[in-house]
A protein has these predicted regions:
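Eukaryotic alpha-helical solenoid repeat scaffolds
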Residues: 15, 19-27, 31-47, 215, ...
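Residue-level detector of the short coil/turn that links helix A to helix B
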Residues: 38, 72-73, 113-114, 148, ...
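Single-residue signature of alpha-solenoid repeat helices
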Residues: 39, 43, 78, 118-119, ...
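Short coil turns that delineate tetratricopeptide repeat
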Residues: 55, 90, 96, 131, ...
C-alpha cells in the first residue's frame, strides 16, 4: 500500500536530528521560504502533540519556540512560549535544562523580539550559573561593542578566547575590531589576518583589515586589499560580506592618501547614481575636492562643481513650477521651504570648495566605522543551522 509523502515523513522522524535533516534537505531543495514553510508547520504540529503527552519536555518546547518563529515570523510569540514554560516548571528544572532555555531566549530576544537588554539578562544568568561558552561571551561582547563600550567588550572577548576550540570566524572578527577600537593595532591585525585567511573575499573583513593596516603602517600589505575592495563597491549593501558602500571606500582611500583612487570612486558613484539633477552634501565632496587639489586637477574640480550646481539649479526650477511637488497637495510656503533646503545643499558644497581651494584646510576623516558581525544563530540545536553527521 502506497504511503503518502507526509505520512511517510511522519513515520521516519522520531528524533530531533531526523527532523533537522528533513528540514535542511527541504531548504536545500527549495529557494523560497513559501516552498519549504510546510516542513516547519509539520514540525510544529508534531511538537505540539508531543507536548500534550509530556508538557515538561525541555527539548520539545525549545524546538517549538523555533518552529513558531519560523511559521509565524514573530519572535515575541516564541519568547512567550519559553517564558511561560519557565514560570510553570522552573522549580522542576535542573541547571542544564534552564541553560538551554536561557540561551534560546537570549538569541530570540536579540534578533527576533528586538530587546537586547533582555538578551544580556539571559546571557548574564548563564554566566552566573557557570554555563559559559564561546557563544555566550562572544554575544555579550557584541552587546557592549554595539554600545561602543570597547573595554567591556574586550573583557568579554578575552574570556571567549578560553574556549578557542568552539570559536567561529565572526568571533575572531568581532574580537579583532574591538582590539582595534581599544588601540591594540598589532593584535587586531593578527586577528583580522586570521579571518582574512579563512574568508579572503569577505568585503567586511577586507575593509577592517585594510583600516587596521593603515594604523600599523603596512601600506604594502594593504595594496592588494585596496585593489580588491574596488571590485566590491556598491550603492547599496545587501550583505555585509559581499558589498562595501561607495562612501566607505572613499573614506578609506582618503585615509591612505590614495587621492587618485578617491577621485575615481567618487566619480564612479556619481555615474552609477545617474546624477542628472540634485545631490546631498556629504563628506565625500570634501574628500573629492581635496583629492583633486592634491593631484593638481584644479580645472577639473572647477568644472565638476559647475556641472553639479547647474544640474541642481535645474531641479530647483522644476520644484518652482510644480513638477516635483504637485501644487494641489503642497502649499506655496511648503514649496518655498523645499527650495530653501535645496539651495542650502548647494551652499554647503560651495563653502567647502572655497575653503579647500583657498586655504591649507584639510578635511579630517573622523567617521570611519567598522560594523560588527552578527552570529547567524545560536539557538540550541536549531534544526536549520545545526551541523549534522
Amino acid at each position: 500500500m502506497r504511503i503518502e509523502k507526509y505520512e511517510r515523513n511522519k513515520i521516519m522522524k522520531q528524533t530531533q536530528k531526523e527532523w533537522a535533516r528533513y528540514i535542511q534537505d527541504e531548504i536545500k531543495k527549495n529557494d523560497s521560504y513559501d516552498n519549504y514553510k510546510h516542513v516547519f508547520i509539520e514540525y510544529k504540529d508534531y511538537l505540539e502533540k508531543c507536548l500534550l503527552k509530556n508538557p515538561r519536555d525541555v527539548e520539545k518546547v525549545c524546538q517549538l519556540a523555533i518552529a513558531y518563529f519560523t511559521v509565524y515570523q514573530d519572535g515575541k510569540t516564541s519568547v512567550n512560549v519559553l517564558e511561560e514554560f519557565l514560570k510553570k516548571y522552573s522549580k522542576d528544572l535542573n541547571d542544564d535544562e534552564k541553560a538551554i532555555i536561557y540561551q534560546d531566549l537570549a538569541d530570540l530576544y536579540e534578533k527576533d523580539a528586538y530587546d537586547d537588554k533582555k538578551c544580556k539578562y539571559y546571557l548574564t544568568k548563564l554566566i552566573e550559573m557557570g554555563k559559559q561558552s564561546a557563544v555566550i561571551w562572544e554575544v555579550l561582547g557584541e552587546y557592549y561593542l554595539k554600545r561602543k563600550k570597547y573595554k567591556k567588550a574586550l573583557e568579554c572577548f578575552q574570556e571567549m578566547e578560553k574556549f578557542s576550540d568552539e570559536k567561529e570566524i565572526e568571533d575572531d572578527y568581532n574580537y579583532g575590531i574591538t582590539l582595534f577600537y581599544c588601540g591594540y593595532f598589532e593584535k587586531a591585525k593578527e586577528m583580522l589576518l586570521r579571518c582574512y585567511e579563512k574568508e579572503p573575499e569577505s568585503a567586511g573583513i577586507l575593509y577592517a583589515l585594510a583600516l587596521c593596516l593603515h594604523y600599523t603602517n603596512d601600506k604594502k600589505l594593504a595594496e592588494p586589499i585596496l585593489d580588491k575592495l574596488l571590485e566590491k563597491v556598491s550603492l547599496e549593501k545587501y550583505y555585509y560580506d559581499e558589498q562595501i558602500l561607495f562612501e566607505e571606500l572613499i573614506d578609506l582611500y582618503y585615509l591612505f592618501e590614495e587621492y587618485d583612487r578617491c577621485v575615481l570612486v567618487f566619480e564612479k558613484e556619481i555615474d552609477e547614481l545617474d546624477w542628472e539633477e540634485r545631490f546631498y552634501y556629504n563628506m565625500g565632496f570634501s574628500f573629492y575636492f581635496y583629492s583633486l587639489k592634491k593631484l593638481g586637477n584644479f580645472k577639473k574640480a572647477e568644472n565638476k562643481l559647475s556641472e553639479l550646481i547647474q544640474k541642481h539649479n535645474k531641479y530647483i526650477e522644476k520644484i518652482k513650477i510644480g513638477e516635483i511637488y504637485d501644487k494641489k497637495y503642497w502649499s506655496e510656503e511648503e514649496i518655498g521651504e523645499f527650495i530653501e533646503e535645496e539651495k542650502n545643499e548647494i551652499k554647503k558644497v560651495l563653502e567647502i570648495y572655497k575653503k579647500i581651494m583657498n586655504s591649507n584646510y584639510k578635511p579630517q576623516n573622523t567617521r570611519i566605522n567598522l560594523e560588527k558581525m552578527y552570529k547567524t544563530c545560536y539557538l540550541v540545536d536549531c534544526p536549520m543551522h545545526q551541523k549534522l553527521d
